[in-house]
Amino acid sequence: MKTNIEATRENHQTPSTTSKRAGAPRVANLGAPDLTQRPPRSPRSRLGGYALLPRMLDKGRATLAGTNGEYHFNCPVDQHILSFIGIEPEKLLAELKKGKGDGEILEWIQANAKHKHEPWETQQWSDYMDRRGPDSDAETLQFFAEYVAKLSKTREDIKTWADVLELDDFVSFGGKA
């Protein structure tokens, strides 16, 4: 007996979702998001307790697929988590190229990270990254204020880099700030 999901999947096959093999459904490549159509996951999303990691994995997979749009793998935000974990971006990209899922990548990171952390350390770091705002130097504060102003003239609640990234993602895909 087929489950409801299997029946639904079978009833909604189209030529673009079926394999060249007769009767075999083709699975969409959900591992490589199209970041020209939607943003990567939130910087607040967690994988293994790590903030930023799911977002960076989305950008890495999209980069490999050529669907990264305006998003850049190994940008300064990504470099924060790469530094904390102690993983070289090229090696992570090579693992993503193998088609590994999030869980497999997390296992690889845990096995290969130069910097091993206790769960409480990872949680504190991730909480800090969620709350991290611009540094107090005038140049950074000005950049932050101008960047937020380009996105919205009315949003006074945008205080952290995570806030800015989420707002930018929202506005970039048609949202009203």
Task: Go through each PLM region and give its residues.
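Short hydrophobic targeting helices and cationic amphipathic motifs
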Residues: 12-13
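Amphipathic protein-protein interaction modules
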Residues: 92, 96-152
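Amphipathic alpha-helical packing elements
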Residues: 68-109
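Polar/charged low-complexity regulatory segments
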Residues: 28-68, 128-177
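Long, low-complexity intrinsically disordered regions enriched in Ser/Thr, Asp/Glu, Pro/Gly
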Residues: 19-26
